[in-house]
Amino acid sequence: KKIKKLIFGFVSLDMIPLESHFRQARQKNEIDVMELDEGMVQWGLRAAAMNLPFLPTRVGLGTDVLTHNPELEYVTSPYSDAEKLVAMPALNLDIALIHVNKSDEKGNTQIVGPDPFFDELFARAACKTFISSEEVVSTQELGGNDGAIFSRFERSLVTGVLHAPCGAHPTSCAPSYGFDIKHLKEYSEAAKSFDEYSAKYLNKTHQEYIDSVGGAETILNIPLPQF
């Protein structure tokens, strides 16, 4: 058992809507959970990023999310409207691991895909942030002012940098490669018996793992999904 409690808005394997390992753990009651609306997760991370104890929000009002999470509190607006809002607590992270397209050794990063997801909030909400990067380059190669648009957070937030080409596999890292659907299906099926999958792919060096799935060239040739 690796996880004691999981706070989440949605758990999937991208192209596979229901994550089978997560489903199995929930059905067996092996983990404590706090299921939230995705907007509440975002607001909790934002509160942590701003070093606030909570942020008021309308997200979650009128839903069973609050019924199933009685620890969540309400707050009343101090202004004339006196609106009742959810006081979403900060989701303070001990550690964040973020995969990026490029970085230098100092922690300057670039995320060039079309959707940065919550990566910036993860970095700001965490006590320590570690970066795995497709490419580790010199600071000059990040492009100066022209490349700054792809830098989502300051290097001062970064604790360490790891060079991990194809490090997002079997998920995608746009624009370099897409989802490895075949591998995701294999991983999903492994919920029935994880030992075989573990022996085949885990407890290896990064390069050994890449080789076990066909090598970097195979991964880099996986097409990006079209939405």
Which positions does each model-derived feature cover?
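Conserved alpha/beta enzyme-core scaffold
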Residues: 1-227
